[in-house]
Amino acid sequence: MRRAALWLWLCALALRLQPALLHSVAVNMPPEDQDGSGDDSDNFSGSGAGALPDITSSHTPSTWKDLGPVTTTATAPEPTSPDAIAASTTILPTGEQPEGGRAVLLAEVEPGLTAQKEATHPPSETTLHPTTHSVSTARATMAPGPATSHPHRDVQPDHHETSAPTGRGRMEPHRPHVEEGGPPATEKAAEEDPSTQIPVGEGSGEQDFTFDLSGENAAGAAGEPGSRNGAPEDPEATGATGASQGLLDRKEVLGGVIAGGLVGLIFAVCLVGFMLYRMKKKDEGSYSLEEPKQANGGAYQKPTKQEEFYA
């Protein structure tokens, strides 16, 4: 009985797993390429993971706003009576009760010092900035400035507001300090924004054609200052040209070069004249350079007179 139940359970499990196996095989197998172009094989990977997911890259423009002057306005004047100070300092949130009245005594003795210390902390964001007394609350409002940023200017990131409350609890507006010599703020924001980086696509054969241009860009950026300042790029070539210029600057070397050129020119003229003379003698029929000599030593002889006798 147990064996029959076990066999039935195994058969049901096999029937349930069969559609899932058929679906995975159908997904992993590439479609039939009927036209023979091979375009359908690019959508599948050889690892058996199925069809590759479509990767969509979204580019969100980064916005950078300059922080304007921080202005604080007091809603009510500071209390001057001891009762009001005590009432304002005893109101604390839950979980931060004073121990033995010591903190209350310190607040009563030095209310101005604690208010100045609390006011010196820099505001983190556009949030409420309460002081130590609850009666006189001050709100810090961030005035957004224009979004245009000048080149080679950057707002100082570590800006702290150190102005203490003067008069009736008002704080003087402190403008952010701008220094020169840095890259534009928009370029920094674009570099730090991860959404601007486009992901690398996956597929068969794409890794073979991926080139890393960061080293070349760094080498080109490092070589630009030298080329702008007129620095030599190849020290060996510049050394050779400098040595040749130094040799030509000497008068002895320059005179020797000119004399050698003149001697060569004279030798070429003589060679051409000799060749022309040989060609002329060849046309006359004599290949020797000397004049032809007569056999009798050059003496003149009269021809013999022949007499004819008539019969």
Curated annotation (Swiss-Prot):
Residues 1-22 form the signal peptide. One of its GO terms (biological process) is cell migration. Residues 277-311 are cytoplasmic. The gene is SDC1. This is Syndecan-1. Residues 151-162, 169-180 have a biased composition (Basic and acidic residues). Interacts with CDCP1. Interacts (via C-terminus) with TIAM1 (via PDZ domain). Interacts with MDK. The chain crosses the membrane at residues 256-276. It comes from the Eukaryota. It is a single-pass type I membrane protein. SMART domains: 4.1m. It comes from Bos taurus (Bovine). Residues 71-84, 215-226 have a biased composition (Low complexity). Residues 32-42 have a biased composition (Acidic residues).
